[in-house]
């Protein structure tokens, strides 16, 4: 998920926090003097990406779970370090940092880091191509044309293009989404588990977000495929549902 998407999810989560929860969040972030982003809750939603790209590539695998499109297996795609083997991924790390955040014994510094990761990973897990792989690095190896000279890869299309086509202002987008969420939707999403969220994103990736096998198997630098007619408007209607849910997934809803 790109900057705008993460900030929209965080802004939506802020809408649903109780005053007491907001006070606690602000108190945690007030102890954090990291300069990679601005210090507020919404800006901190992108901290994990800045940290990864400024000398911490070992955290890269934490942002996704590569479940094979044709044979999804969450257990083999991701294992928490304590289980041995495999590698940590977005589901195991989200659960880990949620535990760190809620543990009374956690240090002040570790609690701030955990909060920043939780903000970020809740968003990443709801970007469909962070939950599935089609032998194309989650769509990163599939180039697509957006019309004219505009090209991108399929992963970036879902990270950023769909978001900015709908509303480039993250806070305004969050306000719009907040107005559309019913109490029934909120309660259902809040009751979900991390594993359920991941499988929901996987299902969306499999049935909606991927390009055909023929295009997937084309060389990475081949001429970009054109988006099918109507794809962008259809995705623009679909994607907001996957921002509403992570924004509502905080226990403070």
Regions found by a protein language model. Name each.
Residues 1-121, 128-244, 248-253:
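N-terminal, motif-rich segments that launch catalysis or mediate targeting to/interaction with membranes
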